[in-house]
Amino acid sequence: MKKLQRIFITISFLFLFVNKGLTANENFYDKIDLFSEVLNKINKEYVDEIDQNKVMDSAINGVLQSLDPYSAYMSPEMFNSMQTETSGKFGGLGIEVGMEAGVVKVISPIDNSPASEVGVKAGDYIVKVNNIQVQGKSLTEAVDLMRGPVGSDIEITIRRRGIKKALIFKITRKVIEVQSVKSKTIDNKVGYIRLTSFNENSSAQIKGEIIEINKNKKIKGFILDLRNNPGGLLSQAIKISDFFLDSGEIVSTKSRKKSENRKWFARKGDVIKGKPLIVLTNYGSASASEIVAGALKDHKRAIIIGENSYGKGSVQSIIPLKNNGAIRLTISKYYLPSGKSISEVGVTPDIEISEANEDFKMNTKTDNQLNFAIKLLNG
């Protein structure tokens, strides 16, 4: 326990020192004094031997998660795993998750991933992992439970709105390869582009696909499918929005410091030359997806079809720490050209079409949202 005792002594000494002359923050430092006292009591009187690292990690994570659902602490192991996942190939279930009121919530399943193949949907709540309750655990702890070797099985219990009975899915972990851009021509008249995430190559790939589709002189219009796209790089959302606009504001961000507030504007040059554009969204469309859909809607450049988007209107920065871990911290909020915030509200479709039924599967005969968009463009 000597290591933990040194932590208590350091905390107490540090905040006794900085407390002098800081009357405006007295209550804040009193709370830290209280925190130190509580840790000391745990150290001396708790019934079992405690895992010192786990206690401190949970305390740090608790501070961050009290700010919003997206700020969190990542241990060195978690940070390393995150860096592996952003390389575009990793082992797992293939879901993007967040926290809502202490419950793990699916933001979106990745296309063709083990989770999407068994029927996990955006908006589902994960309540158990291998029969272990995850409610009350941190997001980091819940994600750790879901990790495992490629080829191993996992059972997750889900609650879904509108369904009384819990749903249980058995999933085999696989290597997840993220292909962010897919395209095709439908009925020789409609250019269809599916974007699953906003990574560093997305804008260049989309522009290349548009150029290729435009070689067909019979193309009447385009569909940009952002369903189940949890977001990604802000820079890519701006570039992709700019492809379809000739002028005007795309998005703005507001930070704690006014000097860091920013606005981005479109440059002249619509790559589809004014042809009709439809954007498909659903509850799994979040963050960067909402920037694109919101900007194109506000400028009346596209018709938004599908369901209301997720409502994640904030920017997170990954800040490395000395222990080789990191914190994910919200540093600013997005605002659409209309001045509206995306946070919690999301982007409302111009034409609302819900997923038809349990047989609904994107980009198939049961995809009523895509089918409606195709009919609209074909006239």
Protein language model regions, located:
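Conserved P-loop NTPase
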Residues: 316-320, 327-356
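An acidic helix/loop motif centered on a single conserved Asp/Glu
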Residues: 50-68, 239
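Cleft-lining beta-strand/loop regions that shape enzyme active-site pockets
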Residues: 21-31, 35, 39-52, 105-108, ...
